[in-house]
């Protein structure tokens, strides 16, 4: 029996986005481990805490889209290295919030420079207008995720 349905992997947007993200993450993780002894998940935690300080781990999961166990494992690793500290949430004593230490900020800044160069290399074939257009489209797609994930045939 001949199959009639098959994805065009160069035109199926979810696959293309996944392939790009997977390859970028794998390359970044390898480089960051070699250079800084942190992987991509630790970098995502560091970068989130540089953007929003004193937040619960749940907030990192929500924004970055990582599962709780991956964030928890990375936070423990970063705490043991002295990069992240936890404190009781002043608004809810049952919760803890996370923030970067001085060493965490320094590590973030070193990785940030490398991440920025990787982004520059990724986008170097695009004009500034194309980059703005790409970012606009990606942000619009990102806002559709809940709508897409709510679909049940």
PLM region spans:
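C-terminal regulatory/oligomerization modules of transcriptional regulators
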Residues: 1-6, 129-153
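A structural preference for long, well-packed, hydrophobic secondary-structure segments
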Residues: 22, 27, 72-74, 135, ...
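N-terminal leader segment of winged-helix/HTH proteins
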Residues: 1-36, 83
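Active-site phosphate/pyrophosphate-handling residues
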Residues: 12-15, 44, 121, 132
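Short, locally clustered residues in the helix-turn-helix/winged-helix DNA-binding domain
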Residues: 21, 47-51, 112, 139
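Charged, amphipathic alpha-helical coiled-coil/dimerization segments
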Residues: 63, 76-139, 143
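N-terminal helix-turn-helix DNA-binding core of bacterial DNA-binding proteins
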Residues: 26-70, 151-153
